[in-house]
Amino acid sequence: AQSVISELAPEAPADSPQEVGQNANLAAASEEALREEIARREAAEFASAAESLRQAMQSMPELAELSKQLIIDQTPEGLRIQLVDQEGRSMFDNNSVQPNARAQLLLRAVSRVINQLPNRISITGHTSAQPGSNRATLPNDWPLSSARANASRLILQSAGVDADRVYQVSGKAGSDPLYPDDPDLPANRRISIVLLREGGTWEHCQQSPEPVSRQECAATHANPL
C-alpha cells in the first residue's frame, strides 16, 4: 500500500526556466558580493601594511634616507613594493647578483611587512634597457635580473619569510622599464616584490565583456599609496 501511495503522490513541480534563471542570478550576485568584500578587505590590509612600512622607515635613522628608494603602490596583482636605484645609490654593484648592504637593509625592513600578511609573494628583477634600442637588453641581463631576484628571495627568507609563500621568482632584464620614456633612468633598475591578491582585481578585469590586458587593468586600477 505504501508503494501505491508513493506512486500516486504528485511529484513536486519542477522550477520554471524563469525561477532557475533567478536562482542563478542570485547565486552569481552573492558570489560577486563576496569577491568584492574580499577585495575591499585585502585593499585595506595592504594600505595598512604600506603605512606600517613607511612609519618603520622613518623611525629608524639608518633607513630614513633609504625610504626614497622605495615605491609602494597597489596594482591589479597586489601590494607592490619596489626597491629602486637612485643616482649614486644602487642596490647592486655593477654586474653583481648580490644585494649590497643598502639593499639588504631595505629587504629586511620589507620582510617585516611581508610577515604581517599571509599572501603569497612574487619577486622580479629588472635591469636598465639600453638607450636607443627600443627596450632591448644585453643578453646577460636576463640571467642577471633573475639571479638578483633570487638573491633577494634568499635574504627575505633569512629574515623570516616562509619559503612556501614564494610563488614566483623571475627576471625581466630591461624589457619592463618603470619609466619607459627614459629607459636609462637609474630607477628602472629595481627589485619588485608583490604580495599577491587572493581575490584580486585582475580576476575581475578578466570577466570584462571587452578584452582587457594586464597593462590596461593596471592603468585603470593602480592605486598609489
Predicted segments — roles?
Residues 1-79, 85-87, 202, 206-224:
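Juxtamembrane linker/hinge segments adjacent to a transmembrane helix in small membrane proteins
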Residues 40-52, 82-84, 91-104, 117, ...:
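Periplasmic OmpA-like peptidoglycan-binding domain that tethers envelope proteins to the cell wall
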Residues 67-69, 110, 178-182:
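Short beta-alpha junctions and helix-cap segments that line functional grooves
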Residues 113:
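Alpha-helical metal-binding/catalytic segments enriched in His/Glu/Asp
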Residues 120:
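Catalytic cores of peptidoglycan-degrading enzymes
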